[in-house]
Amino acid sequence: IKVDDNLYSRSIFTYGMETMKRISTLKVLIIGVRGLGVETAKNIILSGPAEVDIFDPNKVKINDLGSNFFLSENDVDKINRDEGCVEKLSELNKSVKVSVLKVEQKDNINDYIKSFCEKVEKYNVVVVTELQPMYFIAQLDNACRNKNIKLIYGMCLGLAGYVFTDFGPDHTIFDESGEELETYLVKSISRDEEGLVVIDNIQGTNNLKIGDGDYVKFRNVEGMTELNDENKDFEIVFQDFQSFKIGDTSKFSEYKKGGVVYQVKKPKKLQHLDFCLRSAMISDPSHPFNIADQTKKGRVELLYMAFSGVHDFYMNHKCNLPGLNNMDDAKSIVEKVKKMYDTSKENKIPWFAGIQEFDEKVVLNVARWAAANIQPVCAFFGGILAQEIIKATGKYIPISQWLIHDFFEVVENIKDDADRTLKNSRYDDQIAVFGNEIQKKIEKSNIFMVGAGATGCEFLKNFGMMGFCTEKDTKFFVTDNDNIEISNLNRQFLFRKKDVGKSKSIIAAESVQKMNPHFHVEGMQTKVCEETENIFNEEFWTKQDFIIYAVDSVDARKYIDSKVVLFQKPAVDSGTLGTKAQSQIIIPHQTLTYNDKAPPTVVQSIPVCTLRHFPSLIQHCIEWSRDSFSGYFVSDINEVKQFFVDYDGFKMKIQREGSPKLQLNKLNILKMYIDSFVNKDYKKMCECAIQSYTNN
């Protein structure tokens, strides 16, 4: 199995080559492609499986456009959701086969389910992203377990959602954490029934990062040489950040000195319960829910009951969800859930003891907005579902087995009687939740984002889908002075192979505008720094309502943060590292800012004078050659191309450059290339090369 090193370089770095090879053989079925389904499909297709099939034979509705970024207004009431987005999904990664699953309709529901379950036998993972009847999920899960197929079931109901996983009765995990193997120097090892290993923690810089259940091996131990056996590993019991126990060492030789202890990873078995059995054991305290937000005590249990109430309504109303803000529907669900709660309390079911009191508003909010797909919520759960698909390879520990989460804090300050009259628009699901007043504020916003990489692309998509900056005289500015590379394509979904070498910000802006033609977005290539304060001046910063940091440089973050504080602008900073991520909401004078907690800049960028005149390290030579190549064959060539293709745009860009000296330099370079193109003879080319070499 060959994996494209250039396209998947970051994934290989994160997952490892063996996992990437396993991913490249996966066959995935995604049932439902509203907001959650299309997010999941987008994420996993970028990851490079063999096949992804989608199934959603329902007609496109106008409110689908608020969360499915691959559907358009021309699709509404004309084609099925799966047919509407399959082509654009396939464009994300040409090495992945993307198709629509066709299932013949049957008069008898049992015959249809049987036929459907036979169709799924070819897949490794089946993902359900829409509410389904319990009997369908039960039979589908049973079919998956019989064929060792992983089942993942996710749902977004307005501002709440859940994920259920069933990886079968015998799933093997090859790597629980995905972290690098740890290695430590040994300081001492005791000789007793519970052998204690103390590591040499020099100045507290090498604390233990392994814990109970991890395995280690030893080498180069003097004295207690029995530990050096390469065929023997030891399960550890964590003691503190400098020591752990490895079991009985009383019959070993006395430890003298030295030694290295290093972590080893052993395959582990995982047993999941099927959907019906896990649901039946919901009150068993030995099978607790995963709690994502520890501040909401008892919330997960209450949400589960609310979801059960919505499902009962769905089953009793011909597989229809409660109407958006239909208070009769919502109150009937609240009453049913309240009875469930009272019965559980009377029977003293231990699992429900975590619910301090019945919060009617939580259940009401689940019920009244169950039919809504809110774009950022879909993005959140879509990321989780896609990561669970990756875990089917044996990398990382799957969710065990329920994950439930909500975002109801975002509506705490919105009045219950706010105007939520629907407009038959792409934003109807948002209007149903937030109201028309908030939607109007969203549309009237001006936003500035720095960076159009992986997180920047996701931010752009989310803001565009929600309707930000769609009113007259509003604008979403995104700036990034980088160009698109091949390695960007498997995580920056707004770019395609034909875009390699072009500006990230400009292509990203164009791509999102196709998703929502009403989105006023402008891509810029200007770096945000002191040298460009003639462009990003006081007037520019003052006009913005919100700032987003989507950069990968500490220095850039610090500079932007200083402007955020100076001009009193709310902002969000975020970044990723492999499968980890962080985000910070910044409100000047109310929260910490980035500079309040920013790490000292230890690794400085290499000064230009060092690169050009005093290169002393191999890194200097590499950086010099990379910079030179980019200048000769990427940046300068792109400017020449723009001069011929988009003269007005080139002229405007040159005028924005700032200093006359810089403008003159750009024009001289342009003249040199044009002379070379016009006079295409070998001698002229040599003169041009010699001139460039001499000047640099």
Where would I find each of the regions flagged by the language model?
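Adenine nucleotide-associated cytosolic modules
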Residues: 1-696
